Amino acid sequence: MLTKISAGAPYGIATGPDGALWFTLVHQGCVGRLVPGEEPVVHQLDHLDGGPTVITPGADGAMWFTEFQGGRVGRITPSGEVTAFEASSPYGIVAGADGAMWFTCMQTDRIGRIKDGELTEFEVPGGMPSGIAAGPDDALWFTLNQGDAIGRITLSGEVTVHPLPTAGAAPVHITAGPDGALWFVEIGAGQVGRIDVTGKITEYPLPDRAARPHAIVTGPDGALWFTEWATGRLGRITVDGTIEEYALPEISAQAAEPHGLTVGPDGAIWVALETGALARIEVPGS
């Protein structure tokens, strides 16, 4: 099922504590909200050229998002009230075990932390930190897209880096898996990766190594779901490495261009399609 978003190009998507889907419109400077079955509501941000990208729920009942081009981290309440904080090239963002929001600074090789309006930044080894996720060990785990590595930062700022076996892997997004490990996608190598909290890494090649996997999330079925940007497909991988792929609906003659994805309030997988829609995919057996 497709929900067309006439206001622009969806990029990031997440389910909020209010039971709605929240998404970013990267080229229009907007954040949208959709209750499944209803019409979307779009909130225009103060800066049209901010490039809102990743969005995630915070511990405070609001949604938090990054504006990569505008250099801001934003907070939006269910009623649409927006607060912005200056940050350097923020991209990935997630709530940490300490109740703070943690985010990556892609162009300055830093990890940022914001709580109660106070911003702290931690230097990480060069490599363009991109996606970030909260691990089962209370640390934050992040990808180093140009460093071909996975990083770990404790709540106190101690950093460890785990190089990937594959050169040119270019990992992007990362998520906490159902098995106590972190799972990530390698857009450059066409692989899905797994790293446990001891640093042990396993990589699973996709059937099409040119699929350019972009984002990944744990599904309600105990598997990992991921987008394949180049091929317009949705992938599913079990914790033992079995891979399935599903075609996403196209809008007219345009390819889907899937980016972010989330488990919706209805238990389905919702995918942000940059060509102007949100796709809903039923989880088999649900």
Residue map of PLM features:
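Blade-level signature of beta-propeller repeat domains, shared across WD40, Kelch, NHL, RCC1
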Residues: 251-286
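Residue-level detector of Asp-centered blade-edge/turn motifs that repeat once per structural unit
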Residues: 15-18, 57-60, 95-98, 134-137, ...
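Short loop/turn segments that connect beta-strands within beta-propeller blades
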Residues: 34-38, 76-80, 114-118, 153-158, ...
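A short loop-to-beta-strand structural motif that recurs across blades of beta-propeller domains
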Residues: 30-32, 71-74, 109-112, 148-151, ...
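Surface loop/turn motifs at the tips and blade-to-blade linkers of beta-strand repeat domains
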Residues: 3-7, 44-48, 84-88, 122-126, ...
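Conserved beta-strand positions in repeat-built beta-propeller and related beta-rich domains
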Residues: 6, 21-27, 63-69, 101-107, ...
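Beta-rich catalytic cores
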Residues: 9, 51, 69, 89, ...
